[in-house]
Amino acid sequence: MVTQSTYDELKNKYGTVASWTLWCPAEDTKKSNTENLSVFQNPDLLEKLNAKYVFVALNAANHPNFQTKPAWSCFHSGYRYQNDYKLRAATQGTRFEGAYITDIIKYYVETDSSKVKSAIKKDPEIIVNNLKYFQEELELLKSSNNGMNPVLIALGNDAYNLLNKHITGYTIKNVRHYAGYFSDVWYKQHFVDTLSDI
């Protein structure tokens, strides 16, 4: 569960650059309904949200006009080639359903992770500035987790390496990024195999 005050503050500050691992069920195809945000209108929403885990990707891969997007629409794409459905498959019905999901680099839109790493190397202020936002998110979630640090689950090695380099005092796990060339069934089992100890 997440408190109303935590939810409201996260939504107001980070609703356009983060979300929760909560989706409407698929309908006619595996990719269907990932963009349906009506799940966030559920009157029992706060009970379904989970401050124990935070999924962390590297940076926003698309949506340069993210400020105009509805709250929580990140990681909920309706694009025909999206892979968000794999993350839905891996988390739905598990203890990871309803967890917070965000990017460690929020305001640098780029699909090529090597370019992101190069930009950080050239301008360390990118990571310094973004870490302030990320740490604020973690503190807000901590307040809804009995004062305990949430477990951080990196989505891919790039996010994992940044977390290990810059974040201390947290359990940090690593899973494959959902954009990889594998099925949703494989990805769900990957979660089971990789995250069984948390």
Can you annotate each of these PLM segments?
Residues 169-198:
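Short, flexible loop segments at boundaries between secondary-structure elements
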Residues 2-150, 166:
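A polyanion-binding, active-site-adjacent surface
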